[in-house]
Amino acid sequence: MSVKEGAQRKWAALKEKLGPQDSDPTEANLESADPELCIRLLQMPSVVNYSGLRKRLEGSDGGWMVQFLEQSGLDLLLEALARLSGRGVARISDALLQLTCVSCVRAVMNSRQGIEYILSNQGYVRQLSQALDTSNVMVKKQVFELLAALCIYSPEGHVLTLDALDHYKTVCSQQYRFSIVMNELSGSDNVPYVVTLLSVINAVILGPEDLRARTQLRNEFIGLQLLDVLARLRDLEDADLLIQLEAFEEAKAEDEEELLRVSGGVDMSSHQEVFASLFHKVSCSPVSAQLLSVLQGLLHLEPTLRSSQLLWEALESLVNRAVLLASDAQECTLEEVVERLLSVKGRPRPSPLVKAHKSVQANLDQSQRGSSPQNTTTPKPSVEGQQPAAAAACEPVDHAQSESILKVSQPRALEQQASTPPPPPPPPLLPGSSAEPPPPPPPPPLPSVGAKALPTAPPPPPLPGLGAMAPPAPPLPPPLPGSCEFLPPPPPPLPGLGCPPPPPPLLPGMGWGPPPPPPPLLPCTCSPPVAGGMEEVIVAQVDHGLGSAWVPSHRRVNPPTLRMKKLNWQKLPSNVAREHNSMWASLSSPDAEAVEPDFSSIERLFSFPAAKPKEPTMVAPRARKEPKEITFLDAKKSLNLNIFLKQFKCSNEEVAAMIRAGDTTKFDVEVLKQLLKLLPEKHEIENLRAFTEERAKLASADHFYLLLLAIPCYQLRIECMLLCEGAAAVLDMVRPKAQLVLAACESLLTSRQLPIFCQLILRIGNFLNYGSHTGDADGFKISTLLKLTETKSQQNRVTLLHHVLEEAEKSHPDLLQLPRDLEQPSQAAGINLEIIRSEASSNLKKLLETERKVSASVAEVQEQYTERLQASISAFRALDELFEAIEQKQRELADYLCEDAQQLSLEDTFSTMKAFRDLFLRALKENKDRKEQAAKAERRKQQLAEEEARRPRGEDGKPVRKGPGKQEEVCVIDALLADIRKGFQLRKTARGRGDTDGGSKAASMDPPRATEPVATSNPAGDPVGSTRCPASEPGLDATTASESRGWDLVDAVTPGPQPTLEQLEEGGPRPLERRSSWYVDASDVLTTEDPQCPQPLEGAWPVTLGDAQALKPLKFSSNQPPAAGSSRQDAKDPTSLLGVLQAEADSTSEGLEDAVHSRGARPPAAGPGGDEDEDEEDTAPESALDTSLDKSFSEDAVTDSSGSGTLPRARGRASKGTGKRRKKRPSRSQEEVPPDSDDNKTKKLCVIQ
C-alpha cells in the first residue's frame, strides 16, 4: 500500500467517524452570496455557515455591508452569540461555534459601516457584553478585545462600553461595573487572556480626555485591588504583558503629576493628603462642624452592602453638583439650595401651591400606611381638581406655617386627648360643613370630619368639604357608641368620597362610607385649611387614630364562662375585611340581617371538661432503698472531680502517692491549677473526718479527698509543684526574649554599615532641603529612614530609597549588607520588655513567699522542695540581672541615636528597624526587576528596529508599505488592536507633542498637488472592494496621507487634524470630529508614497478613515498602476489573491488568531524566481506584537466551506517538492486594477502587520 492510499483511507475513516454534517451547496460559494442568502444561513447556526459568512463579510464592500446591516444581520449574530454563551460549552463543537460566531461580529466591526452602525444603537454593545457570561475563555478574549477597541475608537464608543459594563453588572447581579474585568484578571493564569484584560483596563482609563474622569476610572480599578494584582503579574515573563503594565504605570504617573500641578501640590490620589488639605482649609471656620457631622454620617455607611454602594454614588453626584453650585454667586436660602441640589434637569420646579399639595399627600400616604385602613383617601385627580375652588373658598394660609402645623397637629392632638378628660363633644356635623370648637380660646377652624361631596353645588355658597367656615350649629347630645346602626341606610357612596349632600345627616366619622365603624367623637386639635381641602382627610385620620370601643353587631359575642376549645382559622387583616365591597364589610351595615347563635349549646359542647379533683388514695409507702454510695459533695463538684481523676487513668491511691512524692510527670501547670480549684472546702473536710463507717461505701471523689487529707500539708505541696513547673515555663519563655533584646541593642550599637548609610542619607537630605528651614542638618531621627520611600522621583515607581540603593550598588557595595546588621533588631520587634519583666518579677516574689512557707512546714516538705525552690530563685535573679543590662544598653542606645532616654521605647525602635529592613530588601528586589524589565524592553526595541530596518524604503527614506494598491478602507478593529498591543504609542505621541506642536506640524504640511481621477466603481455603480481590503466609497478613494502626517496600518487607523483649506476646496470630505489625542500620526513608521509613483493622481479626494485625518492618494505615471496588466488576470480570480493567506484565515481552532497572523504576513513578491523569494519571505517570523488567542490549542483546525469536517493541520506550508502547483500572488508593490463590469466580487485583502 502506497503512502497516498494510506492517507486517503485515514481521511475516509476520519470523515466516517466525524459523521455527516449539515452542508448547503451555497456555502462553498458564499463569496458571491447576497446579504439575504447570508441572513437566511444565519438562521441555521453551524461552524461551516459562520466560517463562510466571516469570509464573505471580510470580502464585502460598503454597499453589501450596509444591506446586511439593514436586514438585521448584526441582530441575528448578537442574538446567536448570546444564546450560545448561555448554553455553555459542554463540547468542543460548541466552543468552535461560539468562536466563529464572535469572529463574524468582529468582521462586521472591522468595517467602518459596521462599527458606526453598532455605535448608533446602545443595545448592540449591551448584547455584545452579555457574551462575557460564558466559560469559553477564547470567546471572552475576543469580546474584551472588541470592547477595548470601541473604547479608543471614539468618545461614543467609550461611553457605550461603560454603559455595557453597567448593564452586565445589573444583569449578572454583580456589585461593581468593573467586577467582571477584575474577577477574570485575578482568577486567570492564561497570559494572552491577562494581556487582553489589561488592555481593556488601559483603554477604559485612557479613553476620556478629562483628567478627573481618568483619575476616577483608575481609582475604581484600584479600589478593586488592581495594584495588588499588577504586583503579582510583574513576575510573569511576557513581553506583551510588560507593555500593558508599562502603559498603565506611565499613564498613572503622568496623570498624577498633572493632577499634582493642577491641585496646587496636593496628592489627589492620597486620601490622607486630600483630607489633611480639606481640614486645614476649614479647621478655623464654623464649617468644620458641618464637616465633622458629614464624616460621622459617612462612618455609618457599610461599604460591603449593595445599597451603600448606590448611596456612595449618589453622594458623589451631589458633591459634584455642589461644586457647580458653589460658583453661583446668587444669594438664596437653605431650602432653595437643597432644592437646586436635588432638582432633576428638565423637570419644571413645582409652585408653592403644588408643593403644599404634595407635602400633604406625602404625609397622608405615610399616615395611611401606619394607621387603620378605615381611612380611605380621596383620589389624587379629584383633589387636584378641587384646588381652584379651595383657593377661592379658603383664606390664604402661609405654606410653611401650614406644613409645620401639619407635622405637629396629630401628635399634639393625641397627647391632649390622652392626658385630659374629654370636654363636651361638638354637635354632629353635616357633610361638607365645618365648625369651630367651643371657646375659650378659639383654636383654628375645625374642618369637617364628614365626607367631601362632589363639587356640584351652586357656585355662590361655599362648597361642602372644602374647609369653609360655617355658623356653629345648636348643641346636640353626644352620640353613644353603636347608635349608628339605628340610622336609615344611606345610598351607596362613591369610593373614597363618602355620601353626597342629599342623604340625611350622618354622625361624625360616618362620612367615609358604610364599611368603617365610626369612633366616638372626641375633640381634637386640627390644622388650618391647606390648599386643596386635604385638611379634612388629615383630621379624619387623627380622630380615627384614637381607636374605638364600638364593635359591629356581627362581631359582638358574649364572653364564655368556661375554657373553650379553639377554632383553627386564618383571620383576615382588618384592612381587607373592611373593604366596602367585601362580604364582611356589608355585615356591618345597619340593614344587615343579624344572626344570633346559641352560645349556651356551643359552650356546653365545645368547652374543656372540668378537671375532677383527685381522691386521696391510700398508697403503701415504698421501702426506702439504701444508697449504694455515700457522698458528702454536691453533684456538680463530685462530677468535676471524677472527670479530673479519670484523665490520669490510674487509681486514686496512685494519684495521692504522686502528690505526696512531688512527682510532676503527669502534672503540668494547667492540671495543677485545676486541682487547686477542686481542693476540699472546710465543711467537706469536717464531714469526711467525722465519717466512721466503711470507706468502701464512700463515693470515688470522697474517697480521693480522704486520701488527700491523709497527706501532711497537701495544699502546700500542690502549690510548690505548681510554682516549680510554672517558673520553669516562664524561664523558658522570658529568658530567650531578654537575651534577644540585649543582642539587638548590641547589634545596633556595633553596626558598621548603619552610620555610613545614615551619613549618606544626611548628605542627600541636606542637598534636597538646601535653603529651607530643614536644611543644613547635623543629624536626623532614626524614624526618618521610613520616609525615604515617600520622596518620589520623576521616574515611575522610583523613590529616594531606590535611587540611594542604586548609587550604593555602584559606589558603596558594602552598604548593601546593612540588612544583615539589622536582622537581630528585626527579630526583636514586637517584644514588649515591660510585660516580660513584670512577669519575671511576679514569679520571683511568689518563689520567695513559697520558700518562706516551706521553711516553716514539716521536714518532709522541706526536704522535697527547698532545693528546687532555691534553683528557681537563682535563675530568676540571674534573669533580673539580664534586665538590668538591657536597661543599661537602652540608655546607651538612646545616647547613640540622640533620643530621650526616658522616652525611648526599645519596642518602637526595633519595629522601625524591621520596617526599614523590609523596605530596603523590597527596594533591592524592585531595582533588580526594573533592570530586567528594562533589558527586556531594550531587546524588544532592538527587535522592532531590526524589523523596521528590513522593510524596504522609498526615495525619501521612509518605509514603503507593500500590498494591494487600492487601500480605500481599513480594518478598524484590527488596526486599533494593533495600537493597543503596542501600548497606545500613538496616544502617547499626541499627548507628548501637545496642541502647539501639532499646530505647527499642520501648518507645515505640503499643499496638495494636482491629481487625476481614478476609476473606483464598476459601470453598474456598485462599489467594489472589501472591508478587509475595502472597496471604494465616496470620500474613500485614496490610499496614502500627506508626507508629514502619513499613516500606516501597522500603527492604527487614527484621527488626525482637519484637512487643509486647499483640500477642502478640492471637494474632499470633512473628517468627523474626534478627540485630538487619539490616533494622530506616527510618521516614523508610516509610509506615505509609493516610490515608483511620487506624484498623486489627478482629482482624487483625500481619504477619510472613519474620523481619521485626510490621506493623499498615490500618483501613478499613467491611468493604471504599474504591473497592472500583468496582474489583471490574477485580479479576476479571487483565489489567486487569497492563496495560502485565505486558507489560514479559515482556521477556527485558534479563532481569529490565524486571521490576524495571515493579515500580518504580507503577500510575497511574484516575479522571476519568485518561489525562492516567496519561501524566504513566508518563513519570516511572525510579528512579536501579535498575541495568540489561546495557547492551550497546539494544533489548528481547518474547516472547509463544503462542510467536509474539521481536521488538524500543521502551521507549515507544503514544500516545493510536493508537486503541487503553487498559486501566483501579486507582489506587495503591485496595485490592483478596477475589475471588469461583469465581475464585482473580487476578493481583496487588508494587510495588517
Swiss-Prot record:
Changing F68S: In CMTDIE; uncertain significance. Residues 874-951 form a coiled coil. The modification Phosphoserine is found at S351, S1147, S1149, S1192, S1194. Keywords: Acetylation, Actin-binding, Charcot-Marie-Tooth disease, Coiled coil, Cytoplasm, Disease variant, Neurodegeneration, Neuropathy, Phosphoprotein. Its main location: cytoplasm. Pfam families: Drf_FH3 (PF06367), Drf_GBD (PF06371), FH2 (PF02181), WH2 (PF02205). GO terms for cellular component: actin filament; perinuclear region of cytoplasm. Changing V181G: In FSGS5; uncertain significance. Residues 974-989 form the WH2 domain. Residues 1170-1180 have a biased composition (Acidic residues). Gene3D superfamilies: Formin, FH2 domain, Leucine-rich Repeat Variant. Residues 420-447, 471-489 have a biased composition (Pro residues). It is found in: Cytoplasm, Perinuclear region. Belongs to the formin homology family. Interacts with actin at the FH2 domain. Interacts with DAAM2. This is Inverted formin-2. It comes from Homo sapiens (Human).
